[in-house]
Amino acid sequence: MKEERSKIKSDILLRVRLLYVLFILAGLTVFARLVWVQLFSAEVAYNADRLASRIFTEETIPAQRGSILSRGGAPLATSIFRYQAAFDFASPGLDSLKTFREQSDSLAKLLAAFFRDKSAAEYSRKFREEHARRYRLVNGRDTTYLRSEGWFSRLMDRLRGEEFATRRIYDTIRDHTPVNIFPREVDYAEWQTLRRYPLLNWNMGMVYRLVERDQRVYPQGELARRTIGLTGDKGNYGLEEAYREELAGRDGKALRQRIARGFYGRVAGGGHEDPEDGYDVVTTLDLDLQDVADKALRRQLEAQNAIWGTTIVMEVHTGEILAMANLGRAGTEGAFYERENYALGRSMEPGSTFKLATMLTLLDDADMSPQTAYDTHNGDPVTVGPAKNIRDSHRGDHVIDFRRAVASSSNVYFAKAIWERYGITGKKQEYSDFLHEKLRLGQTVGLERLGERAPSITTDWKVPDPGVMLVKMSYGYRVRLAPIQMITFYNAIANGGKMISPVLVRELRRGDRVEERFESRTLASSICSRSALREVQRCLELVCTEGTASLYFRDTARLRVAAKTGTAQITDARSREGRYYLGSMIAYFPADNPRYTVLTTIETRAQAGKAYYGGPLAGPVVKRMVDYIYNRNRDWYGRVERHGPRRHPDRIKGGDIAQIRRVAD
């Protein structure tokens, strides 16, 4: 008996031990599997990542793009938020059809009155159709349920034989795709009104997602649009492109959790990083001056039926660009608009405005005396070296000196002077070296970031016609410069021989804090000797008093202006259709203490009754800019006190000065 009991006990212990072993093995297997899943299984990790990526995603929080401002702080380009309400018509908050219809009908009336694009009935119909399309009841079936919950109520129902009731239930099909309900995006002020409307005020729950978009707007319209620029599908140019990184700022990021299709909520924490808005770019542009330049240039282009034109106003001592207008025609008969940045991107033969470089070369490098005279043959064509048919555009001059040649813009004079000193003597290389190294005309002026085209002035004289090239270079052909390079060159003469780079951006700001300030760079401390500087300054004044610009500046009684005009015939594929010209005028003023330099360049076609020479073509625009700047700077002319000493005009534009003084008394 004892043996049987002992045997039974041993069997039981054996079985228990076996069970222990089995449980331990099972536990070890489960543990090993967990370790494998957690640490080594690529498939499980992949599936877990996929599941997490469907629920949690990293959202980029876009930084607000910085603004581009005028020198006075007026916005030229800025970003504003636009809003759209994307509705989830399958949201459980809208399951009550009666409440939804009441609220949506009220919203429809308010939206119809706000946007005035369609009737309230159309809005209401749209809401109901979208709700019916995205929220559907299917597979209807009856189900039985207890009518009451408490035991006493159930007892009474049983006594009445009404313990159970039948209800029809449905499965639902929900499409959570967002639907935009506004006919257009709205701004912040409009959204503050709309958010108080039914449904939009969350009175039926979170049934929509507010979509924000950062939109770029240009408050000044087309004014300086080519200089301001653009980024995106329509092109990348101007300040918008040049300062893309500074304006863009740094985007932030946040973790968001999927709530329904198209709807997400941000998760607190989760590596959240706030965005850093972009810098504001403060330009040197004067908004009033830019407006005057645009209107004056547009008026002249329309009056002369021209092709395109550009006007630049530059401050002499700082190099700041106060205005830069670029207008081109859309087609042959279209209106003018900011089509291309001609000031920076058009490198063309400048014509007689290049004679300033020839003047400095003759005076400084060749040591020519201003009294040197040449016969210009009264406007008849002459041969100078290997170049034939060199002629002046006017008659009346025979033997003239240096100053008269500048005032009348004589091609023959400068062609002969350059050929005699650099052609006959075989010093062509010295001529081009002086233009490049001393006058710095072969280099850009520092606006490459904005699309400045490099100039073209030869340094290689191994060409088929080096003599002809030398002669033509003397009066502005066979060289190519952009208008910005020409005005920088003339500004150096106004600035006492010191050439500085033009500046279009003053500073980068974040709020009221200046992060970086920009100033002009010295390109050449002196491009000429003092004697040559005084001589060319005197000659440029003569252009305005008795030369090709005298029509516009001869009678400026209180303001002395120095200028040079230029005309170049354009030779390209269009030459068979007619004659095309580039007319220019570059001026600085006041001549005795220069503060501003102005350039206008216009391309046109020779037409009956229309101008194509530089003076009459560009002069009216330059004249308008000079007058406007002078009239708005009251510190240039003194005030006459009511009870002060008598004052008489020193000069008058016309008439008898004795009678003028008598009237003044």
What would you call each of these model-derived segments?
Residues 1-335, 429-438, 552-556, 571-577, ...:
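Periplasmic/cell-envelope proteins involved in peptidoglycan metabolism and beta-lactam response
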Residues 3, 77, 258-272, 276, ...:
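Beta-lactam-recognizing serine transpeptidase/beta-lactamase-like catalytic domain environment
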